[in-house]
UniProtKB/Swiss-Prot annotation:
Its main location: membrane. Keywords: ATP-binding, Cell inner membrane, Cell membrane, Kinase, Membrane, Nucleotide-binding, Phosphoprotein, Transferase, Transmembrane, Transmembrane helix, Two-component regulatory system. This is Sensor protein NarQ homolog. It comes from Haemophilus influenzae (strain ATCC 51907 / DSM 11121 / KW20 / Rd). Residues 367-566 form the Histidine kinase domain.
Length: 567
């Protein structure tokens, strides 16, 4: 992406300029160095011109025949390519060129004297000619030195220029790239630490770093706004969760108070007071129908505020009214609705519980009345008959009447003792059913209460479910078991009594009382004894079957067979 004032473009331009300068300087240095290639040869050749000119003078005097050969050599040296190359260089100084032309002109005259073997004129001009050659050699050496100095100067200037340009590029890069990136790094670390108001970045620059700074600043600003919104949302959710938790806690505490205690005006007052405080209510009132003494009011009603009302009802049965006025902060309407439902259910269950208690009380009274009628009423009827006979015999004074009277009194005492014993057993059974409704434990309690009356071993084995019988059925079963066990203790003359409760092959409940004694002779009861009849009557009320018979291995078995479904 092109950006006005691009840092990368400017750095690229600077580097390109440095490359161009380095290329130019390198080319110039190479040109200077290449121009020095013939300088040494030219200096050597020009220096040899002096020796050759003296040699020609000697040969003119001593060996005239070799002068022509040396002249050709001299001509070759004087017009050598090294000297011509130096003369043809575009930056050769004019002094050097004039000096070379002067040597050429003088050598024209000198060559003429040499060819004419004119030793006198040749030697006369030789001194000046050698002086000109020496001057040419001097100028040639100075020109070579100047070129080396120029080359070194150019290289030095180039190095200095490149160094300055590189320094500028470094300074520019540090100012335009490194420092902004360093600031941006600090800013990013601050953003990472949730400090969205980071150090200011230079967003005015129209380059890549300026664009990046603007984008980063905008991003951090948006992140800060987003974080603030998220923080507000989290705080709002946290507040709602706290409110929900407080609501659930309030409902839980209210439910605990209503479910774990017998509801009354004190419990209702505790629940309403808890709601009144926790939900910042200004006014709350509950009215219970049929129990006006339970009406509770907390706070003061404000006539200017709306009164909210919830009817306490279950299955369209209206039980009361809950009304309230909210304070600040306003409570969740659902908590008051749930509270109204809990209060309605609690009042409904309390009402049903009271009704069930009344029914149970009436049923218990009915059971007691029936038991008293089945046991004691027959004894009292027998006593009344005996008392009538006794009164009749007392009117007679003969000896036989007295004996009958004594027999009646004995029967009277026996019946009275038996009735008293039945009353104690009946009371023990009622206490047992009240204290323990579990069949197995109730059987054990009955048998344990009889252990003091005998030395026989008595074992209980109950395989029926613990809640197989309701309280009324349990009373009948326990009375039958007590009566059968008492008969075995009194009449069996055995050593072991087995009491078992199980489910037979047909799926019926069976309760067995077995002993290993002499066995029952028959099912006829003596006069004044009604135990077997009472057992049979109880079985009829249970819709059960009673079987009493002698066992083949000895002893008596009393078996009660009950249908599987009793309720």
């Amino acid at each position: 992406m092109y950006t006005k004032g691009s840092v990368s473009t400017r750095i690229a331009k600077y580097l390109f300029i440095i490359l161009i300068v380095a290329g130019v300087i390198s080319s110039l240095s190479l040109a200077i160095m290449s121009s020095n290639k013939y300088d040494a040869e030219a200096i050597n050749i020009s220096g040899s011109l002096r020796m050759q000119s003296y040699r020609l003078l000697y040969e003119m005097q001593e060996q005239p025949e070799s002068v022509e050969t040396n002249l050709r050599r001299y001509h070759i040296s004087l017009h050598s390519s090294a000297l011509l190359e130096v003369q043809n260089q575009f930056f050769t100084p004019n002094v050097l060129k004039h000096s070379y032309q002067n040597i050429l002109q003088r050598w024209t005259n000198m060559e003429k004297y040499a060819r004419q073997q004119d030793v006198k004129n040749y030697s006369k001009q030789l001194t000046d000619y050698v002086a000109d050659v020496d001057y040419f050699v001097f100028e040639l050496q100075r020109f070579s030195e100047q070129k080396w100095i120029l080359g070194v100067s150019v290289l030095g200037f180039a190095m200095l220029l490149i160094l300055l340009m590189v320094s500028y590029v470094i300074w520019y890069t540090n100012r335009e790239v490194v420092k902004p990136l360093h600031l941006m790094t600090k800013a990013s670390m601050q953003v990472q630490m949730r400090q969205f108001n980071h150090i200011p970045l230079d967003t005015r620059k129209q380059n890549e770093l300026g664009t990046l700074a603007r984008v980063f600043t905008q991003m951090s600003t948006e992140l800060g706004q987003l974080y603030s919104r998220l923080e507000e949302a989290v705080n709002e959710k946290t507040q709602k969760l706290r409110q929900t938790n407080r609501t659930l806690s309030t409902l839980y505490q209210s439910a605990q108070l209503l479910n774990t205690n017998t509801i009354n005006d004190k419990i209702l007052n505790q629940v309403l007071n808890y709601i009144f405080i926790s939900d910042h209510l200004n006014f709350v009132k509950v009215e219970v129908m049929g129990a006006e003494h339970w009406d509770i009011t907390l706070g003061k009603q404000d006539a200017n505020n709306e009164l909210q009302i919830e009817t306490l009802s279950v299955d369209n049965e209206e039980l009361g009214v809950l009304s309230w006025q909210a304070g600040l902060p306003c409570p969740d309407p659902r908590i008051m609705q749930n509270l109204a439902q809990m209060l309605a259910r609690a009042l409904y269950f309390h009402k049903n519980l009271r009704q069930k208690e009344q029914l149970l009380l009436m049923e218990e009274r009915s059971i007691i009345a029936r038991e008293l009628h089945d046991s004691l009423a027959q004894v009292l009827s027998f006593l009344q008959i005996q008392l009538t006979l006794l009164k009749h015999n007392l009117k007679k004074e003969d000896e036989q009447s007295k004996e009958k009277s004594l027999a009646i009194i004995a029967n009277f005492e026996q019946a009275l003792s038996g009735g008293y014993a039945q009353l104690r057993e009946l009371l023990a059974t009622f206490r047992l059913t009240i204290q323990e409704a579990n069949l197995q434990l109730a059987l054990k309690q009955v048998i344990d209460s009889l252990r003091s009356q005998t030395t026989m071993q008595m074992n209980v084995n109950c395989q029926l479910p613990s809640q197989s019988l309701n309280p009324q059925q349990l009373v009948h079963v326990l009375q039958i078991v007590r009566e059968a066990t008492t008969n075995a203790i009194k009449h069996s003359q055995g050593t072991v009594i087995e009491i078992s409760a199980r489910i037979n092959a047909e799926g019926e409940y069976e309760i067995l009382v077995e002993d290993d004694g002499v066995g029952i002779p028959n099912l006829e009861e003596p006069e004044g004894h009604y135990g077997l009849n009472i057992m049979a009557e109880r079985c009829r009320q249970l819709n059960a079957q009673l079987h009493i018979h002698r066992r083949e291995q000895g002893g008596t078995q009393v078996k009660i067979t009950l249908p599987h479904t009793l309720y």
